[in-house]
Amino acid sequence: MFTTVRPQSTLTPPTANLIPNDLFTAINELKKDLNAVILAHYYQDPDIQDIADFIGDSLALSQQAASTNAEVIVFAGVHFMAETAKILNPDKLVLLPDLNAGCSLADSCPPEAFAQFKAQYPGCLVVSYINCTAEIKAMSDIICTSSNAVKIVNQLPKDRPIIFAPDRNLGRYVMEQTRRELILWQGSCMVHETFSEKKIVQLKIEYPEAEIIAHPECEPSVLRHANYIGSTTALLNYSQQSASQIFIVATEPGIIHQMEKETPHKRFIPAPAINNCACNECPHMRLNTLEKLYLAMKFKQPEITMDETIRLAALRPIQRMLEMS
């Protein structure tokens, strides 16, 4: 493994007496003491979103990480996001409240297997969705997010074949939008692949005036019913601008917190999963809590560290993305 983290063995085991009663105040005090910035993804719990200095999707968080003057970056997200912050900020302390906050999509693309896959298609440009490990980024020519994937692919030479990894659903969506053939790695997100088309159609029958808005990581069977498809930021913006008053939201329901804050008079219904859950929460994103956020800042652990060779190789395609965005 090239990407490593410092072990948590130096931490005092979290106990009730380590957690202050007023976590918001304690975290804000630590933030000042450390000259820290808290970056949070839209899929985090509402209380983490509310204490964050910046909330956004993967592209916005990458841009924020690249431009911050803070000495410490506390990333309330999942591992690949904290890795990206470290790639962009090798001299800063980057903390992830829970090291187990992984990503099923990133896990679906093991570096060794992807290297073999890439070798089968010499001469291809490799476009990798940011939801991947540092090792995959290091094997890529350019990184993209759901916000800019179509824009990125449209700017690439027409005479060069393209490998797109790791999300097959986003890849299919990009193919449709750009009318370019892509060689797709067959990865997927556990949240977005389990929305129930049948239940979504039933909801639409129950609320005929509702608009279905969906993330492009969703399966094609769901996307074909969507009135609007976009990244989390795009979905948030659309929900504010649309005249509709009811939305069926086919992405991780953490984004609904911001939607309700921006337009409290509108109704947002999380799209149901195939199973009996009322909605699709990402179990990895939800591992982060205010308590873990506080402890990470208090003990300056767990810290993201990385092999410099991998970091430099991964930095180049990220920088290309930021330049082309």
Curated annotation (Swiss-Prot):
One of its GO terms (molecular function) is quinolinate synthetase A activity. It is an enzyme of class 2 (transferase). Its EC number is 2.5.1.72. It comes from the Bacteria. Keywords: 4Fe-4S, Cytoplasm, Iron, Iron-sulfur, Metal-binding, Pyridine nucleotide biosynthesis, Transferase. GO terms for biological process: 'de novo' NAD biosynthetic process from L-aspartate. It holds the Pfam family NadA. It catalyses: iminosuccinate + dihydroxyacetone phosphate = quinolinate + phosphate + 2 H2O + H(+). It is found in: Cytoplasm. The keyword Transferase applies. Binds 1 [4Fe-4S] cluster per subunit. [4Fe-4S] cluster binds at residues 103, 189, 282. Its cofactor is [4Fe-4S] cluster. Iminosuccinate binds at residues 41, 58, 129-131, 146, 215-217, 232. Catalyzes the condensation of iminoaspartate with dihydroxyacetone phosphate to form quinolinate. NCBIfam families: nadA, PRK09375.1-2, PRK09375.1-4. This is Quinolinate synthase. It comes from Rippkaea orientalis (strain PCC 8801 / RF-1) (Cyanothece sp. (strain PCC 8801)).
